Curated annotation (Swiss-Prot):
There are 4 isozymes of pyruvate kinase in mammals (L, R, M1, M2) encoded by 2 different genes: PKLR and PKM. The L and R isozymes are generated from the PKLR by differential splicing of RNA; the M1 and M2 forms are produced from the PKM gene by differential splicing. L type is major isozyme in the liver, R is found in red cells, M1 is the main form in muscle, heart and brain, and M2 is found in early fetal tissues as well as in most cancer cells. The modification Phosphothreonine is found at T41, T195. Keywords: Acetylation, Allosteric enzyme, ATP-binding, Cytoplasm, Glycolysis, Hydroxylation, Isopeptide bond, Kinase, Magnesium, Metal-binding, Methylation, Nucleotide-binding, Nucleus, Phosphoprotein, Potassium, Pyruvate, S-nitrosylation, Transferase, Translation regulation, Ubl conjugation. Its cofactor is Mg(2+); K(+). The modification N6-succinyllysine is found at K66, K166, K322, K498. It comes from Rattus norvegicus (Rat). This is Pyruvate kinase PKM. The modification Phosphotyrosine is found at Y105, Y148, Y175. InterPro entries: Pyr_Knase, Pyrv/PenolPyrv_kinase-like_dom, Pyrv_kinase-like_dom_sf, Pyrv_Knase-like_insert_dom_sf, Pyrv_Knase_AS, Pyrv_Knase_brl, Pyrv_Knase_C, Pyrv_Knase_C_sf. There is a cross-link at K115, K266, K270 (Glycyl lysine isopeptide (Lys-Gly) (interchain with G-Cter in SUMO2)). The modification 4-hydroxyproline is found at P408. Its EC number is 2.7.1.40, 2.7.11.1, 2.7.10.2. The modification Phosphoserine is found at S37, S97, S100, S127.
Length: 531
């Protein structure tokens, strides 16, 4: 039964799907899930929106922030630096328009998505808009001869990857335009391949090419990427989504380009091919987080295996305590329709159940007809899915996975999450400078939201990458007396939590603080009733 309005602020955090959360077995947990369980106020999963023509005005961005956008993604495969600079300016203007109210202010992060080392076809008949029809069974010659760079047609196709003849074999497959067109290699020469069209269709200019299974030796960071990354450092972006990462060395190269000035930018590696999946552990070790980029991945590995790769990557990221983003086609049909398909709803929910920290929208918000509806839909689905996570089992397993650690901060984080379960805390309040304390708490996946109070704007923005962290930016001057300064920040978190309906007077919250100034000393845990 719905609660009367007078109790609208009631903390549903502890009670949503509580019966299921306390089950002894996973089967019993599934049996107890209840569609009438009232949803919580807080959503713990981050929502990343790609900003494009449909969403780059300040007014639209304001509405998207209100609807739940946490991170704005700029896709550098398209657009000039001037175009992106204006988008970044608009995102910041939209974010700052809420700054007058510190309680409702939400820091929004900016992410730069690199184009990465791609292989592309040439121009069809010298025009960017011309198309030719490739018929099934027809013969198509692939050439490296630059004379054909702008003269491709249905008989001959130029590619910009010089080593293609070395890395593909007779019998190999070549996919063009997101896998819509497939070719099989019949014969190879020094600078050409003869292929047969297996799946035809109309082919436009400058389309992407995939070579599944081939050991492509393109540089990890292209010349364009270097310029884009330097632009990102100048624009003070918060994170980089690095495309087509195949090995740890690729991540180090991105890090090198970002340099000293960009050393605090988080690098999220996009796994988009077989080699990236195979060498996942070394990539994870070198990265700040991972994106499961299902688009290209679904061409490079068989479509029916993508879900295996998704579960494996999310599992390993959860075990390592690093953020993971699930992306591509999450609500694809909402580009043209106001409601998602049932399959898409399940896909978003299952990404959350798998353990994704963030879920991403691409075309839905960049060029779709219903950008706001797509953000709201992801918000609603994620909120329901989070409550259906079997937290009891998950916490036990995460605690067991890190039982070897002797890091005091990790012990504090684990203890605070365990305490939050035991006393049904409505939230965990963490005071953090670098963000590390909050990240460690998030690692153990508490049911309750983590309100992370920081004075560092970048720490606040980057916190959205981690599930369950609600960053609160404290703009008050530091008080001389440390204890008073701690109280100031804890009270700010209490006010934010009450205003957002996370908890009400009399609820219990867990407070994690340091006992002296500086980063790296979070070592005091208190269980505090909300005043």
């Amino acid at each position: 039964m719905p609660k009367p309005d007078s109790e609208a602020g009631t903390a549903f955090i502890q009670t949503q799907q509580l019966h299921a959360a306390m089950a002894d077995t996973f089967l019993e947990h599934m049996c107890r899930l209840d569609i009438d369980s009232a949803p919580i106020t807080a959503r713990n999963t981050g929502i990343i929106c790609t900003i494009g023509p449909a969403s780059r005005s300040v007014e639209m961005l304001k509405e998207m922030i209100k609807s739940g956008m946490n991170v704005a993604r700029l896709n550098f495969s398209h657009g000039t630096h001037e175009y992106h600079a204006e988008t970044i300016k608009n995102v910041r203007a939209a974010t700052e328009s809420f700054a007058s109210d510190p309680i409702l202010y939400r820091p929004v992060a900016v992410a730069l998505d690199t184009k990465g080392p791609e292989i592309r076809t040439g121009l069809i008949k010298g025009s960017g808009t011309a198309e030719v029809e490739l018929k099934k069974g027809a013969t198509l010659k692939i050439t490296l001869d630059n004379a054909y760079m702008e003269k491709c047609d249905e008989n001959i196709l130029w590619l910009d990857y010089k080593n293609i003849c070395k890395v593909v074999e007779v019998g190999s497959k070549i996919y063009v335009d997101d896998g819509l067109i497939s070719l099989q290699v019949k014969e190879k020469g020094a600078d050409y391949l003869v292929t047969e069209v297996e799946n035809g269709g109309s082919l436009g200019s400058k389309k992407g090419v995939n070579l599944p299974g081939a050991a492509v030796d393109l540089p990890a960071v292209s010349e364009k990427d270097i310029q884009d990354l330097k632009f990102g450092v100048e624009q003070d972006v918060d994170m980089v989504f690095a495309s087509f990462i195949r090995k740890a060395a690729d991540v180090h190269e991105v890090r090198k380009v970002l340099g000293e000035k960009g050393k605090n930018i988080k690098i999220i590696s996009k796994i988009e091919n077989h080699e990236g999946v195979r060498r996942f552990d070394e990539i994870l070790e070198a990265s700040d987080g991972i994106m499961v980029a299902r688009g290209d991945l679904g061409i490079e590995i068989p479509a029916e295996k993508v879900f295996l790769a998704q579960k494996m990557m999310i599992g390993r990221c959860n075990r390592a305590g690093k953020p993971v983003i699930c992306a591509t086609q999450m609500l694809e049909s909402m580009i043209k329709k106001p409601r998602p398909t049932r399959a898409e709803g399940s896909d978003v929910a299952n990404a959350v159940l798998d353990g994704a920290d963030c879920i991403m929208l691409s075309g839905e918000t960049a060029k779709g007809d219903y950008p706001l509806e797509a953000v709201r839909m992801q918000h609603l689905i994620a909120r329901e899915a989070e409550a259906a996570v079997f937290h009891r089992l998950l916490f036990e397993e995460l605690a067991r996975a890190s039982s070897q650690s002797t890091d005091p901060l990790e012990a504090m984080a684990m203890g605070s999450v365990e305490a939050s379960y035991k006393c049904l805390a409505a939230a965990l309040i963490v005071l953090t400078e670098s963000g590390r304390s909050a990240h460690q708490v998030a690692r153990y996946r508490p049911r309750a939201p983590i309100i992370a109070v920081t004075r560092n704007p970048q720490t606040a923005r980057q916190a959205h990458l981690y599930r369950g962290i609600f960053p609160v930016l404290c703009k008050d001057a530091v008080l001389d007396a440390w204890a008073e300064d701690v109280d100031l920040r804890v009270n700010l978190a209490m006010n934010v939590g009450k205003a957002r309906g996370f908890f009400k007077k009399g609820d219990v919250v867990i407070v994690l603080t340091g006992w002296r100034p500086g980063s790296g000393f979070t070592n005091t845990m208190r269980v505090v009733p909300v005043p």
